[in-house]
């Protein structure tokens, strides 16, 4: 019946035909119903036997030629497999080839292992970097420069490996993204084993072949996957030289019966199905019974184990204390070591600073500083340094800088005499003694004062040999030296050696010395300084993170490091046994420093003050371990390493820090015991077996003032000396110890242990503790008395008022004045007069100048970045601006809860904040959240590198639970997944139930830490465009980079002194300003929204597409701020975009297409871009940097030896470029001159980001150029432009021409601003390029440029990079300060050959910066350079009157702009968005098409608009006259300037009279003309006179005493009237007879004839007023057309 029912349902389509239904009856199928199964029949399966024994090591792979014989043999059906292929370990070659093949997208068998990565990549550096990066992640201990080594030699052939990070991840990704459901890694292994007999290791090898040839898409079925694996296995077999035979399993029934074969795949699938069913049932029961399956079954055992371990830990902690356990934790890591050996660059800095900076002024005033400086130069002497000194000295002789000649001569002598001499430490010890005083306020002060009766070099030696209190020689009392065993007194010899060392110095050249315990201010640190001065290679340890101590040691090395010296700083805990072993092993190991120590100074110590015997605890045990037990361990490790390397003829000298304090002081824990314990080593030399490895010298260190251990006792040092004990300064004791390492004393030490006593007689002092106690009591009593007297005086003064009131010493809190920072104006007499030759060779109208600039970056504005770059910290004003920018404070001017208040308040609490309090309150927050730092998700659109999100594709192995969705969405699922999705409509709704079935592939989000790019130069936290005044409705619509740029451009106008950008159009046409802002990526956030968010089905704005275009940002700038019709050009030069923008604008202005341009670049920091850079290995690996102990602020290290990639940044940089005459006319500040620029591509290649040298073409010329007579530097009567110079052909390079146009040579370049990205390749290529250019152009050797690497503080912002660099160069010229590259802790030794560059690591004040060269490189063969010249050269082209006039106007403009900017900042209105165009719509066309249209300023409101009746703004008569005269002055001869000024004043007076003092009058037209009388000769031409003058005019002229003046004045008047009529000209030769100038009693009158009358009436003129003003050699005619409807007065 059941069967019939089902059959009927199938026929009626109520049930699918393929439904699998089983019918069981209890009478026939009772076992099946009760789940009873028969026991499985045992089948004898013959185990496969490998007849060949497996080799112990991996067999050598056969050559490919042999592999051709390999084959896959199909198995005959009846024959069972009896052999299994031997499993072998993976070889490095297999992994290497797989990784390379995958990157190159080539078959794995086509990769020859005899070639290197570089050869295989065929010049593609990005690909090469990726492969090498994968190798470093995959393997350990790779050789240096693995890209140059053949693949087969990269990893030892005998090394068997497991998969590394990269290969494991690739296999995992292959399985998850390309294999069908349930065909996971385990299934793949089983398949290869069951079918081909491959073991687990060979299966992995097959999968390595698979990752080199992945399927293009996910394989649709298990069968397809098996076919893919079969093909891959065959390729592997071909390479491995093995034969694959398909395996099968056979089962036979007895003789002659039927036989059957069991398919293992089917069996495995059945087993898996049953297991899955059982698991489901188990989980369902667990859920029903509320059993937590995730809870460990052995929870009680785990808890018991935890209790046991905790008890052990508690016992250890109770015995040793947590402090002890923490104190012995190892900290040594060779990765955290820092190396300093760039003594050569420090020498260059010193010499260059001497000749170009203000160093000579300091040295001239301080004889001791001068002597130390000369010693430093002599210790760094070399041929190149001598050549540099001589070259700069010759230049100084020409410039004659006062006081420098003598210093230069002495410096040259010091260097030349020491070139072949090893470095020598000359220690200058001014003998000092302690002095303790008590002030009137009761303050106890300790000072060092000179000792009486001693002076000179040997003063310290004299002190040591002075007589004691009884008048006896005291040498043996203060210091002594004895042989520890024979007790031979060697004191006199040591004293002689001390005198010799003080006089001649000590050399430690070539010595390797380890010093522990050399913290700042310690004896050890001073010993390090002396050793470095003597040329030693010193390894010094620090117990703190290197980042906190590195600056101190870097500065020490720069001050003291001599030639051949080296300082290695490493973190080390001497209390840790492991650190003691690891440090010494690292020094001796060939993979470490590979050095044998000449000396060890285990000076590490810790204070134990205030601890008596009853208080001794775990801390004292820790210190005892550090100062005694660990010293033994460390020395023992030295012995072991020497013996392992058979070093038995070079004992390492050990200077043991002993003490005369054998409990003398008391209360110092186990300090004395530790020192006494070390003394035992003196005897162990004879009683133990290591005398060939170590030479012991005990050093009893006496009372040393100023150390960390003795600080508390310094105030009683004077009392101790009063009792005949000698105390030492830190420098004196360090000298004593260093002297023991001189060759003579080392020889004595090797013969027998020495005991050097520098106790100063302390051990002989009786009752030391009582003396100290009494002295301390006396001092404290004196202080108490002084304080009591002062308090009494204060009370008496308050009561009687008879005593004088104390003067107030509390400083008045300073207010901050926020200023834009306009450039200083040079003094005409001192700075411009010496350059007067430029007045005749340079035309301002053919000059491009920078009149404004701004930036927005990790340090905020350009001003703030400069403070950090040049000084390392913010000023008070800087902190104020930064706090405002980060929304920590806001300005109020109005009523508050505490009354009316004007000033800053806290943004959150509203509490008032004084300017002087800002640093204290917000300084830490500001420093933490600005600059280069860990990426803040808030500042990067939510991107968190610690949780970088990816989509992981998986194949669904089980049907997923149903979920509800709309019918449209459900159909979309079906469209994507087909039959792998089932849809069931929900009755009564439009929704469906959707179930994703087994076999579907889905993507699951996952988060992975992405530490590589987790550091960046982000905008200061809290920055908001709203603070700048951008309307809130625009902020979400625009991409962040557009917001950055709008804010930047607005601020750049303020820096140009322009408070309203529309003012520009008073002077130039709307079309004459260009917008050349560029970007490398454009609106990254909006681009991501358009591509990724649409894919993720997120809501996005409908016009997001427009925000992704690179030119959209420039469009927003124009639409919101300017409304110009000039060109918008959007350069895209990757990281060189900024230079390309400048280059394009320079060409545009010089070709007269524009007169002003906005240039610069903008870019964002974005997740996808950051990941892209990391895959190219271009950016710094943050994880590795942190492992090296680097702080985020240290990770951008241009030119440093340890640099490892650039740090990304974002923001915007802007400049406003302007034609020189426009800048003068407007009275704009001039920050610098753009003298020349270029862009260049590079050679043939395959690598887009590879650094090139195509930019060398900027210096292209045929040998040393010989300038012809028309050159500006040789012919002072010709005016030339940069463009004409650049076209001089092969003899003059564009670079030379750029400088020559301003009378400068290649030697006058002072600064090179480097692209300096902190990548290995760029930072070597760029200096090489610049040095080649300098060599080719003949720059004098020995005159290096200062190399500025700005990215050390900003990171690399891509497109704005060159804009920020240019801003920095302008600030360098104005401040005359060369900023430091503080992160270049050790300049790469490879840059020593770049002799035309000096890399400053400290700021340098210089006397002048004449010119700079800026270089930038971008991916995609974009190279560019810009030459800039100081603004004084531009001003030198002006005569004094013009310059003074300009100075007045620019000063007024600057003050106005400063006030306006401060007001705008405090009111959050820096950006003033234009709501509408400054003209009526109906006037637009004629304004656009009239080149003379100009905007009008409203005198009452200060706003700007185009006057419908006067679109040319001719009504502004005075302004027009001023502009005309100013322009003429620029072109006039110097001797004609005064006459021009006289005529101008007369014309201005007439205009004042006519206009009543108003700037505008009700006029229709104005005409102005100027005639230079010295150039006027037309009156001699009869034809000219006949055509242009009426009979009356000719008669008047001929009756005049000066006919030339008469005709010239009438001609100027005619021209002015003609301009006033605004009629269309008939050409230059048109007659002017229709305009007649009639003599009148008061002023000349105008009489028009014929067509001119019509023109006047057409212009709506009722009258034309005329003035002719005379100067000495010129005259000015002004014609004003008066509008009106009355009878025309000009018809007479």
UniProtKB/Swiss-Prot annotation:
Induction: Expression is positively regulated by the dothistromin-specific transcription factors aflR and aflJ. The keyword NADP applies. Residues 44-80, 1263-1287 are annotated as: Disordered. Keywords: Fatty acid biosynthesis, Fatty acid metabolism, Lipid biosynthesis, Lipid metabolism, Magnesium, Metal-binding, Multifunctional enzyme, NADP, Oxidoreductase, Phosphopantetheine, Phosphoprotein, Transferase. The modification O-(pantetheine 4'-phosphoryl)serine is found at residue 125. SUPFAM superfamilies: 4'-phosphopantetheinyl transferase, NAD(P)-binding Rossmann-fold domains, Thiolase-like. It catalyses: acetyl-CoA + n malonyl-CoA + 2n NADPH + 4n H(+) = a long-chain-acyl-CoA + n CoA + n CO2 + 2n NADP(+); a fatty acyl-[ACP] + malonyl-[ACP] + H(+) = a 3-oxoacyl-[ACP] + holo-[ACP] + CO2; a (3R)-hydroxyacyl-[ACP] + NADP(+) = a 3-oxoacyl-[ACP] + NADPH + H(+). Its EC number is 2.3.1.86, 1.1.1.100, 2.3.1.41. Residues 948-1430 form the Ketosynthase family 3 (KS3) domain. Residues 90-174 form the Carrier domain. Pathway: Mycotoxin biosynthesis. This is Fatty acid synthase alpha subunit hexA. The gene is hexA.
């Amino acid at each position: 019946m059941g069967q019939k029912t089902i059959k009927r349902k199938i026929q009626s389509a109520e049930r699918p035909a393929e439904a699998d239904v089983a019918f069981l009856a209890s009478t026939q199928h009772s076992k099946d119903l009760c789940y009873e199964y028969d026991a499985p029949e045992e089948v004898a399966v013959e185990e496969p036997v490998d007849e060949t024994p497996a080799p112990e090591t991996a067999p050598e792979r056969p050559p490919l030629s042999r592999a051709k014989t390999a084959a896959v043999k199909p198995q005959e059906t009846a024959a069972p497999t009896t052999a299994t292929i031997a499993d072998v370990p993976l070889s490095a070659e297999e992994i290497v080839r797989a990784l390379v093949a995958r990157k190159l997208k080539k078959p794995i068998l086509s990769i020859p292992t005899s070639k290197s990565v570089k050869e295989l990549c065929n010049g593609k550096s990005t690909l090469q970097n990726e492969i090498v990066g994968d190798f470093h992640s995959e393997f350990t201990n790779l050789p240096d420069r693995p890209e140059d080594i053949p693949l087969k030699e990269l990893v030892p052939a005998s090394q068997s490996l497991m998969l590394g990070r990269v290969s494991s991840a690739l296999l995992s990704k292959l399985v998850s993204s390309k294999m069908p459901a349930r065909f996971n890694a385990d299934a793949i292994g089983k398949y290869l084993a069951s079918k081909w007999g491959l073991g687990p290791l060979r299966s992995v090898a097959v999968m390595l072949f698979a990752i080199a040839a992945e399927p293009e898409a996910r394989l649709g079925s298990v069968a397809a996957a098996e076919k893919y694996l079969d093909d891959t296995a065959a390729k592997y077999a071909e390479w491995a030289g093995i034969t694959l035979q398909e395996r099968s399993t056979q089962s036979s029934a007895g003789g002659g019966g039927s036989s059957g074969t069991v398919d293992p795949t089917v069996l495995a699938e059945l087993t898996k199905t049953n297991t899955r069913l059982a698991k489901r049932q188990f989980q369902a029961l667990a859920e029903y019974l509320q059993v937590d399956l995730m809870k460990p079954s052995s929870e009680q055992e785990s808890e018991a184990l935890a209790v046991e371990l905790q008890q052990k830990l508690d016992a250890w902690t109770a015995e040793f204390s947590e402090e002890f356990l923490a104190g012995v934790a190892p900290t040594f890591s060779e990765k955290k070591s820092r190396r300093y050996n760039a003594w050569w660059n420090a020498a260059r800095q010193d010499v260059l600073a001497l000749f170009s900076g203000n160093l000579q002024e300091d040295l001239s005033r301080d004889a001791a500083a001068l002597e130390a400086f000369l010693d430093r130069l002599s210790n760094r002497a070399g041929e190149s340094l001598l050549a540099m000194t001589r070259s700069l000295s010759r230049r100084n002789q020409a410039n004659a800088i006062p006081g420098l000649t003598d210093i230069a001569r002495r410096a040259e002598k010091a260097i030349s005499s020491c070139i072949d001499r090893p470095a020598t430490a000359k220690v200058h010890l001014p003998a000092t003694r302690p002095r303790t005083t008590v002030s009137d306020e009761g303050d106890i002060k300790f000072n060092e004062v000179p000792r009486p009766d001693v002076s000179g070099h040997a003063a310290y030696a004299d002190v040591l040999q002075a007589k004691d209190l009884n008048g006896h020689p005291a040498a043996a009392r203060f210091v002594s030296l004895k042989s520890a065993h024979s007790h031979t007194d060697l004191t006199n010899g040591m004293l002689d050696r001390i005198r010799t060392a003080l006089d001649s110095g000590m050399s430690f050249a070539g010595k390797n010395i380890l010093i522990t315990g050399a913290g700042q201010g310690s004896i050890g640190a001073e010993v390090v300084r002396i050793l470095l001065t003597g040329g030693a290679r010193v390894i010094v340890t620090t117990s703190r993170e290197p980042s906190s101590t590195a600056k101190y040691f870097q500065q020490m090395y720069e001050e003291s490091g001599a030639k051949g010296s080296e300082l290695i700083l490493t973190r080390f805990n001497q209390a840790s046994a492991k650190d003691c072993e690891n440090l010494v092993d690292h020094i001796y190991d060939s993979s470490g420093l590979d050095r044998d120590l000449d000396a060890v100074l285990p000076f590490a110590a810790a204070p134990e003050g205030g601890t008596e015997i009853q208080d001794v605890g775990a801390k004292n045990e820790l210190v005892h371990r550090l100062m005694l037990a660990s010293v033994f361990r460390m020395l023992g490790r030295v012995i072991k390493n020497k013996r392992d390397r058979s070093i038995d003829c070079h004992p390492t000298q050990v200077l043991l820090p002993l003490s005369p304090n054998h409990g003398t002081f008391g209360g110092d824990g186990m300090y004395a015991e530790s020192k006494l314990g070390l003394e035992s080593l003196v005897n162990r030399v004879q009683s133990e077996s290591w005398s060939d490895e170590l030479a012991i010298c005990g050093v009893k260190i006496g009372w040393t003032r100023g150390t960390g251990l003795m600080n508390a006792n310094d105030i009683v040092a004077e009392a101790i000396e009063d009792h005949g004990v000698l105390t030492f300064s830190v420098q004196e004791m360090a000298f004593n110890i260093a002297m023991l390492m001189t060759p003579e004393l080392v020889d004595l030490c090797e013969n027998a242990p020495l005991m050097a006593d520098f106790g100063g007689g302390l051990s002989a002092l009786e009752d030391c503790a009582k003396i100290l106690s009494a002295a301390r009591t006396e001092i404290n009593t004196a202080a108490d008395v002084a304080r009591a007297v002062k308090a009494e005086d204060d009370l008496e003064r308050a009561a009687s008022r008879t005593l004088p009131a104390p003067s107030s010493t509390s400083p008045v809190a300073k207010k901050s004045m926020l200023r834009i920072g306009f450039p200083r104006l040079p003094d005409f007499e001192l700075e411009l007069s010496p350059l007067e030759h430029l007045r005749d060779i340079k035309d301002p109208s053919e000059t491009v100048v920078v009149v404004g600039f701004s930036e927005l970056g990790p340090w905020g504005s350009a001003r703030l970045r400069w403070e950090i770059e040049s000084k390392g910290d913010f000023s008070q004003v800087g902190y104020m601006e930064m706090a405002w920018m980060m929304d920590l404070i806001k300005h109020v001017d109005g009523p508050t809860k505490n009354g009316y208040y004007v000033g800053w308040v806290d943004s959150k609490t509203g509490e008032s904040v004084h300017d002087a309090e800002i640093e204290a309150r917000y300084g830490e927050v500001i420093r933490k959240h600005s600059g280069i730092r860990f990426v803040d998700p808030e500042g990067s659109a939510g991107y968190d590198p610690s949780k970088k999100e990816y989509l992981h594709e998986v194949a669904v192995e089980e049907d997923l639970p149903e979920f509800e969705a709309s019918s449209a969405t459900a159909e979309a699922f079906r469209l994507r997944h087909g039959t792998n999705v089932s849809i069931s409509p929900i009755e009564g709704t439009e929704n469906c139930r959707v179930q994703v079935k087994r076999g579907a592939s889905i993507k699951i989000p996952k988060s992975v830490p992405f530490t590589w790019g987790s550091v960046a130069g982000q905008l200061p936290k809290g920055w908001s465009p709203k603070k700048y005044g951008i309307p809130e409705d625009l902020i979400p619509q625009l991409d962040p980079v557009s917001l950055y740029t709008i804010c930047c451009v607005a601020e750049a106008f303020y820096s140009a002194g322009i408070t309203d950008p529309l003012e520009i159009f008073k002077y130039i046409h709307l079309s004459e300003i260009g917008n050349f802002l560029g970007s490398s990526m454009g609106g990254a956030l909006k681009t991501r929204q358009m591509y990724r968010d649409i894919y993720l089905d997120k809501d996005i704005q409908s016009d997001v597409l427009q925000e992704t275009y690179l030119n959209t940002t420039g469009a927003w700038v124009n639409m919101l701020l300017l409304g110009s019709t000039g060109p918008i050009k959007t350069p895209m030069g990757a990281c060189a975009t900024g230079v390309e923008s400048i280059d394009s604008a320079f060409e545009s202005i010089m070709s007269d297409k524009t007169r002003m341009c906005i240039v610069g670049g903008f870019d964002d920091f974005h997740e996808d871009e950051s990941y892209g850079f990391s895959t190219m290995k271009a950016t710094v690996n943050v994880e590795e940097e942190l492992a090296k102990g680097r702080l985020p602020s240290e990770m951008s290290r241009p030119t440093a030896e340890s640099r490892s990639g650039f740090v990304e940044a974002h923001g915007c940089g802007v400049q406003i470029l302007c034609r020189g005459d426009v800048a003068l006319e407007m009275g704009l500040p001039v920050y610098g001159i753009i003298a020349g620029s270029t862009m260049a591509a590079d050679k043939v290649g395959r690598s887009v980001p590879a650094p090139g040298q195509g930019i060398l073409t900027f210096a292209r010329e045929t040998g040393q150029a010989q300038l012809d007579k028309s050159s500006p530097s040789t012919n002072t009567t010709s005016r030339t432009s940069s463009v004409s110079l650049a076209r001089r052909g092969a003899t003059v390079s564009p670079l030379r021409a750029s400088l020559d146009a301003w009378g400068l040579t290649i030697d006058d370049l002072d600064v090179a601003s480097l692209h300096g990205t902190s990548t290995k390749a760029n930072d070597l290529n760029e200096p090489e390029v610049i040095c080649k250019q300098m060599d080719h152009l003949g720059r004098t050797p020995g005159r290096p440029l200062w190399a500025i690497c700005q990215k050390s503080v900003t990171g690399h912002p891509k497109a704005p990079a060159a804009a920020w660099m240019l801003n920095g160069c302008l600030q360098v010229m104005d401040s005359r300060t060369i900023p430091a590259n503080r992160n270049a802790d050790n300049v790469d030794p490879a840059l020593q050959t770049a002799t035309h560059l000096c890399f400053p690591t400290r700021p340098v004040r210089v006397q002048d910066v004449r010119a700079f060269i800026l270089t930038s490189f971008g991916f995609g063969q974009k190279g560019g350079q810009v030459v800039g010249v100081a603004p004084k050269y531009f001003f030198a082209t002006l005569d004094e009157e013009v310059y003074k006039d300009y100075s007045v106007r620019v000063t007024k403009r600057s003050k106005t702009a400063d006030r306006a900017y401060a007001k705008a900042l405090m009111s959050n209105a820096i950006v003033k968005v234009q709501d509408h165009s400054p003209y009526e719509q109906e006037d637009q066309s004629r304004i656009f098409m009239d080149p003379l249209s100009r905007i009008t300023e409203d005198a009452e409101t200060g706003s700007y608009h185009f006057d419908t009746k006067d679109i040319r703004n001719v009504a502004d008569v005075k302004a027009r006259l001023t502009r005309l005269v100013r322009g003429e002055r620029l072109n006039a001869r110097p001797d004609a300037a005064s006459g021009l000024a006289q005529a101008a004043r007369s014309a201005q007076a007439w205009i004042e009279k006519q206009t009543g003092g108003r700037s505008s009058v009700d006029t229709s037209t104005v005409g102005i003309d100027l005639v230079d009388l010295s150039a006027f000769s037309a009156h001699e031409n009869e034809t000219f006179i006949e055509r242009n003058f009426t009979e009356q005019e000719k008669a008047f002229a001929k009756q005049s005493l000066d006919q030339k003046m008469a005709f010239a004045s009438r001609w100027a008047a005619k021209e002015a009237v003609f301009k006033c009529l605004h009629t269309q000209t008939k050409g230059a030769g048109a007659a002017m007879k229709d305009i007649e100038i009639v003599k009148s009693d008061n002023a000349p009158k105008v009489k028009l004839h014929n067509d001119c009358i019509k023109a006047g009436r057409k212009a709506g003129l009722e009258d034309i007023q005329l003035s002719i003003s005379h100067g000495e050699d010129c005259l000015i005619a002004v014609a004003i057309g008066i509008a009106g409807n009355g009878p025309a007065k000009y018809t007479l």
